[in-house]
Amino acid sequence: MVSSLFINPFSEDAREIVRKYGSLDTIDDTRDELLEIGRRTRGQNLADNSLLPASIAELAVKRLEWYLRRQRKDFNHRDYAYLMNPEIEEYDVLAFYILAQAAGAGFMKASREARLVVESAGAMVEDRLNVFGGEREEIMAEVLYELGSEGLRWTELADLLGSGKLKLTDLILKEGRVIIDRDEFITSFQDSIRDRSPDRLYDILVGLEVRETMISRMIMQRTEEYIGMVREMSSTVEVHPLILETAERIRETVEEIMSFTGGPVKSARPGKLVQEAFPPCIRGTLDGVRSGNRNDAIVLLLTSFISYARLYPSVFRDRTPMKVSDLDPDLRITLGEILPVIYDAADRCEPPLFEDDPQEKLNITAKLGFGVHDMPELENEGESKWYTPMSCEKIKIHLPDLCRPDKLCSSISNPLTYYNRKRWKLRSSGEKEE
């Protein structure tokens, strides 16, 4: 049977491996056994030797590289098949901690790099659980026990729930306790269940997907906390140079894979707004909207349009999910260019939007993907979704006064499509350069 080490780097066995490991001076040393595991992994692409990690530090970076490439259209799972091989588990535990320490020592807790390391930990759990057959449920039960799910009260998950990584509606509760174990579910509810098998109902309500989500999110939360702890310690303790070197490799890897000079997001480079290319509905919104249409026009239409037009105009063509910080890592553009345009339009409304509805500033922040807060902050990103612009059809229904189509409108279905096409025409004719 595969051990929980392969899934849970926070188990006592995993911590023991870390405690017994020698000096950090050796994390960059070539490990023949690690290379051999990669070579004998079923399905591994062996055509390129650079695909296989030769050291623990290299394996650490490969974990992140796998996650970043996994989101691209050209991803080949055979390039990283060794990461799904349980034989790698002891090296992988060490690599996990090297990666997390490098993220904590080299970057702010709310940085893009730290966030990607946390997300990669959750994604790794999900993919690894999916490779198991009949052992999957047993391993999940063991990992949940290790993570402290037995007798867990939902209030103990406050940080996890507050982060948006887990929803209260995902959980089965009884008297404040989270019911996740099969036997506990049957014992707790069998007297209340009529005309159904308790086992079957458990599979429906607390199925593999719910347990997988809980494991993934709990490990993400602990990874985030560990990175934060390392960050605090790094201000008082000298960081090992190889950890800092790994942090630099993380930076280079993120920049290389998420750069906008190639790959599926080639056309996603942020560019200055070209107001001459705005469609009539957006121009009308910028001029100011009367009471009745103000909220939807500013919060739903303008916020998404301006943010995507400035940061990611090719979203519908690339179809690659992005967050604002992927394109604006320090939020300088968001705070300095995007929000002022939206707020100015809100002030031109009759009456000014925020005078009547100051809470709409919170909704604008939420529509950008930063949750219900006064202003976008990196630490809150992911609490909500970054919404794409409304379609022309929805604008006709919800904001008919703003829909005053011109000739170009007849051939498009979204204001952002209008913007891209008009911008291209302006560039082609030489009327406007970005």
Swiss-Prot record:
Keyword Transport: no
InterPro entries per the UniProt record, alphabetical: DNA_primase_lsu_euk/arc, DNA_primase_lsu_PriL
Keyword Iron-sulfur part of the UniProt annotation: yes
Residues annotated to bind [4Fe-4S] cluster: C281, C392, C403, C409
This protein's UniProt keywords: 4Fe-4S, DNA replication, Iron, Iron-sulfur, Metal-binding, Primosome
Cofactor(s) in the UniProt record: [4Fe-4S] cluster
GO biological process: DNA replication, synthesis of primer
Family matches, as NCBIfam families: PRK03968.1
Entry's family note: Belongs to the eukaryotic-type primase large subunit family.
Description of how the protein assembles with itself and partners: Heterodimer of a small subunit (PriS) and a large subunit (PriL).
Full protein name: DNA primase large subunit PriL
